[in-house]
Amino acid sequence: ENTARLFNASNSFFDNLSEFTSGKEKFLYYLQNDKLNLFVNAAGHIIHGQSFSTETSNVEFFDLGIRARGTVLDHLGYSFSFSKGGIAGSKSLAATVDPRLKYNFKFVEDIENIPNYDYTEGYLRYEVSPADNMLIALQLGREKIKFGYGYGNSLIISGEGPNMDILRFDFRYGIFSFSSIHASTVGEYNDAIQARYSKYIASNRMKVSIPDLFDIGVGESIVYSGRGLEWAYINPLLFYKYAEMSLQDRDNGTVFLDLQTSFIKDFEIQATFFLDEDILSNLQDLDLFSNKTAYQFGFLWYEPFSIGNLSLTCEYTRIRPYVYSHTDYMNTFTAFGVNLGHRIGPNADEILTKIGYNFSSRARLNLEYRHSRSGENIYNEDGTLSKNVGGDVFQPYRYDVDDTHLSFLDGIQHNYDFISAGLRLEPWREIFLDLTYTYSQDKNLSTGNKNVISYLVCKLSIEY
């Protein structure tokens, strides 16, 4: 048997505990029979972050959680998890080391004497296969969402935002697949409870997979708020942009196309084209403010130049001004104040390169370099907006005020360089040690000022 159980009546507790460093898959408890599967794990993390910037600082994280998952009668799947953690040291460094803290309510609220955070996820998923090569599934739960491709970040929904409460429908038959989600989340954090609000995101994606050639998909998303559930957006068999027009054009709609190839062995290409709002008029006038478009393309090459266990990834992303923004700030393409799409935001581009090398099944080296450029809005000394160049997802275009035409990267240009080197070790099964060094530099080309951040993170992860 290749599994170990901490709570196992067949052995003493200490005999079970001795399996901690074994090569077996470990559980607190598991149950398997022809009707029910249940697997329960405990997971904990100890993290130390050390900054080497102008002001040296450090931070420590400690968290512990439980995860349970399984199936009932082969059709109903379930998962449940939660974790709670505390922080000692620099809060600003903590949010740099773990960006998830920027949208964690307990961390942002910051009213307790010890900074802390918590996370919880869970879902129920019912799945059937009524015919060969056919799958139908309905899922209700809370988890992260990722829609679309992207080796660095997806242009559509990156999966790096907060967990959302989701109703999901999936259908697959042969080469055709379709997914539809309706999710709820929240807006920016506000100290005043009455100013907090919920918002909703609906998205559909249809994909055709041609074996050994490519997968091609088309999809759409809608962000809306200020009211309860909009029944039109719960219907998966509807073109949301046209439905949004019939609902008096209050919401933020996007459309996207994406492609992933498989016709070259060990070499994969991904590409995405993203259209925000205006999808028909003036597409030939690329500098018009309403042409809120973005595109991304890249490749993954496994064992390039016949170098075993090596992977090489390159990707370019370009996002025009005002993408992800909306005339109603509550309908921006954000959750808890964090951009749901690509991290660089509007009026920006990025070149990304990743190299991964497996020394063995228990040791992996990861190297990453990113160079991005962004054009930021110009503000007066008193904080008022002087020139809007579409560089802020929360600052929409102002009719009769802002320029109707603008160049890409207009405004105050920043060049950002990011370098990361990480080593992951698994000395024993499900016990991981991660060592990561990060260096980043943000240069304001108008003033020549630089903001440099460098830090080392040591992370111990244990699951039993």
Label each residue range with its predicted role.
Residues 1-215, 221-226, 287, 291, ...:
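Outer-membrane beta-barrel channel domains
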Residues 117, 214-222, 227-464:
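Exposed, low-structure sequence patches enriched in small/polar residues
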